[in-house]
């Protein structure tokens, strides 16, 4: 089967045009890793860019890469019309059986629905819900992206929902839905947890520093626990240089000797942090299919996660992790304390989580799940 994956090259997103290797984000990268193990498929990754970049012909023996140059006027200000036209031209050359638009907030979804070929979409961020939560101003990026999401969903053959949370959000718009979680890069399954016993327990909190990720409330929630137990909290993620929430975060971290903000970590670094962590915490107010939870489970690291959004699809409370209420400081502290004070039970949960992750999130398993969806779509189209 010949498949096209429309996805964003991170070099375009972050304007890092000098980097020699394309990168498509953690979930799409892991899915491609899975496809590379399926010899029955031929995959073409197509990404639009505003500047020429180094473009390898192949990412894997059965995975080709196409970088399409689109002038600035062909992007969001014109409804991604330039991207749509460039993609259609390339697809006429490739002649795929099916097109998969990864993400609804930029050019990928709308290019998929106007591709002229059978297509499906994956929603990674639930932009309509995020925009509503953030109360975004009219004509801001998220406000426009939310409307783009509403436009594209009903025009596709279906939506691959990475959690039931997403499925519920699109049922009123989508022609068809399937629930299939994101894949996790295979290297995370090779992590061997080895917390440093000669140092305080290490709590890892990974994510962009922002109100939705709720780091400030998480810090305050642990103040009382820090009076009776030693631990350290490491925050990994970018923080805007200007912003009231980010400024408050920096003040909270600086005032507490048990807190550190280490900025953005690369994929190899992240796995090293996982190996040394006692637990990973996700205190978000809203999240769909947080990769840090999937990756923690794959690595065999205990998880304390907020009972919000799509997280209940990923974690079973008391079985493969611990839930907390992100609006209740006592609940957050209690979840963390359960892991810190009962390491044997925490280890058992982490082992069960790793088993579940092998079944549900391994790249090959998720790629095979996608292949079944594509076959269903094509059987209905024909």
Question: How would you name each of these model-derived features?
Answer:
Residues 1-52, 382:
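N-terminal subdomain of nucleotide-sugar transferases
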Residues 302-305:
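Short hydrophobic beta-strand element within catalytic cores of glycosyltransferases
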Residues 165, 183:
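Carbohydrate-associated surface elements
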Residues 285:
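Aromatic "clamp/platform" in nucleotide-sugar-dependent glycosyltransferases that forms part
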Residues 4, 160, 195-213, 219-223, ...:
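Conserved donor-binding/catalytic core segment of Leloir-type glycosyltransferases
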Residues 140-158:
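Membrane-proximal helix-turn-helix segments that form the acceptor-binding/catalytic region
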Residues 229-258, 268-271, 345:
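Short, structured helix-loop element that forms part of the nucleotide-activated donor/catalytic region
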Residues 317-318, 322-329, 338-344:
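Conserved acidic donor-binding segment of nucleotide-sugar-dependent glycosyltransferases
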């Amino acid at each position: 089967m010949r498949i096209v994956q429309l996805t964003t090259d991170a070099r375009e997103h972050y304007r890092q045009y000098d980097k020699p290797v394309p990168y498509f984000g953690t979930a799409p990268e892991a899915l491609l890793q899975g496809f590379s193990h399926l010899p029955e498929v031929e995959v073409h990754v197509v990404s639009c860019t505003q500047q020429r970049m180094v473009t390898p012909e192949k990412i894997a023996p059965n995975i080709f890469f196409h970088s399409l140059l689109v002038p600035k006027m062909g992007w969001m200000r014109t409804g991604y019309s330039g991207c749509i036209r460039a993609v259609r031209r390339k697809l006429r050359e490739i002649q795929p059986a099916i097109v998969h638009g990864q993400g609804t907030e930029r050019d990928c979804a709308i290019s998929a629905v106007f591709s002229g070929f059978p297509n499906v979409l994956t929603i990674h961020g639930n932009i309509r819900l995020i925009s509503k939560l953030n109360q975004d101003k009219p004509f801001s990026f998220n406000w426009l992206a939310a409307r783009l999401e509403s436009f594209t969903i009903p025009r596709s053959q279906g939506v691959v929902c990475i959690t039931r949370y997403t499925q519920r959000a699109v049922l009123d718009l989508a022609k068809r839905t399937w629930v299939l979680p994101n894949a996790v890069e295979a290297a995370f399954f090779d992590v061997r947890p080895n917390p440093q016993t000669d140092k305080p327990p290490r709590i890892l909190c990974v994510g962009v520093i922002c109100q939705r990720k709720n780091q400030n409330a998480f810090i305050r929630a642990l103040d009382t626990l820090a009076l009776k137990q030693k631990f350290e909290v490491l925050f990994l993620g970018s923080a805007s240089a200007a912003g009231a929430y980010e400024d408050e975060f920096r003040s909270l971290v600086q005032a507490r000797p048990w807190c550190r903000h280490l900025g953005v970590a690369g994929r190899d670094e992240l796995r090293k942090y996982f190996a040394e962590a006692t637990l990973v915490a996700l205190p978000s107010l809203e999240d769909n299919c947080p990769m840090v939870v999937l990756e923690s489970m794959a690595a065999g690291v205990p998880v304390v996660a907020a009972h919000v959004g799509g997280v209940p699809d990923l974690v079973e409370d008391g079985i493969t992790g611990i839930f907390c209420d992100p609006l209740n400081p006592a609940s957050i502290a209690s979840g963390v304390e359960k892991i810190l004070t009962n390491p044997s039970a925490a280890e058992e949960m982490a082992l069960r989580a790793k088993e579940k992750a092998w079944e549900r999130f391994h790249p090959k398993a998720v790629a095979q799940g996608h292949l079944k969806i594509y076959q269903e779509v094509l059987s209905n189209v024909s």
